[in-house]
Amino acid sequence: MPEYNIEMFPAITPKDNPFKIAEKKGIPIDLFKEGYSRIENCVSAFLSHHSLWEKCYEEKTEYQIFEHDAVCTNNIPKFIPYQGCISLGAPSYGRFETPMKIGVGPLSSKRYFPGAHAYRLKPVGAKTLLHRAKTDARPT
């Protein structure tokens, strides 16, 4: 099993005034208004991820990002071919898209990014996410 250097990152919380942070970064919060979560918590979680995207892009290094409650149930390979960002697992909610055939074929997932609980990110992917956050920020 590959070994990884794991570094805990201090999360942004509602005590940090996430609305002010989002405004300062030019991130709209309109799409965070939904019926399942408290908006302050959603914006805080998003900004925690956003901070790591900034670090990934600035440091020009690949990141693996795990939320505090992510559970690894299998080995994560060192090398995974991907473009900018790839989910490393399956969320505990929603339906999965089942491949139409067994064997080698394209990866299948959901129509949207299947959760932010565990993912790998390249600087080019971080740049894309940072750009999209200016217009399309929503709960992670």
Question: What spans do the regions from the language model cover?
Answer:
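An acidic/histidine-cluster motif and surrounding catalytic segment
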Residues: M1-F66, A70-T140
